[in-house]
Amino acid sequence: MQDFEKKQLLQKAKNVAILGLSPDESKASNVVARYLIAQGFNVIPIYPRANGEILGRKAYASLQEAFSDEALSECGEIDILNVFRKSEALRAVANEVLRLKNKPKCVWVQLGLFNENAKAICENAGILYEENSCIKLEFERLFSKVD
């Protein structure tokens, strides 16, 4: 995505689901989630071993659960799916996103992670795709105030 597209997406986005949001505060996914919450985003945790809540928010065990009609009735549509999974898992994640009834506008894959197949799957389905890019660092860069 070009900078203007990222900026527009981040300005309009309200709900960010984070796949792989660890309850461990030392993990990058948790640091990013806390930052996004501080910026006013509603973060929806998705973690396979979720047990109740992460960061005071209801945690979901799977994409299907987080993107279900019941879950979305609480928050509305999910704008961005931020993915913290290994590059090898991204194709399966993209295929899973395609099977969702309620799809995100964007799949954002964290810094150091990339998969051409996943990118093609999402883009061919009309879903924005950003990879090898930290949403926290991009938000800071795009919206930092210069004196």
Regions found by a protein language model. Give the residues of each.
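Short N-terminal or domain-adjacent regulatory/targeting segments
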Residues: M1-K12
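ADP-ribose/adenylate-binding Rossmann-like module
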Residues: L100-C122
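Short, acidic/turn-prone active-site loops that include or flank metal/cofactor-
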Residues: P48-R49, E65-A66, Q110-F114, S133-E138
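Glycine-rich, highly charged phosphate/nucleotide-binding loops
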Residues: M1-Q2, I54-G76, N82-A94
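Conserved beta-strand elements of the Class I
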Residues: V16-L19
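NAD(P)-binding Rossmann-fold cofactor-contacting core
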Residues: S26, R34-L55
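Active-site capping/gating segments
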Residues: G126-D147
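Short phosphate-binding/catalytic loops that engage adenosine nucleotides
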Residues: F41, N102, I127
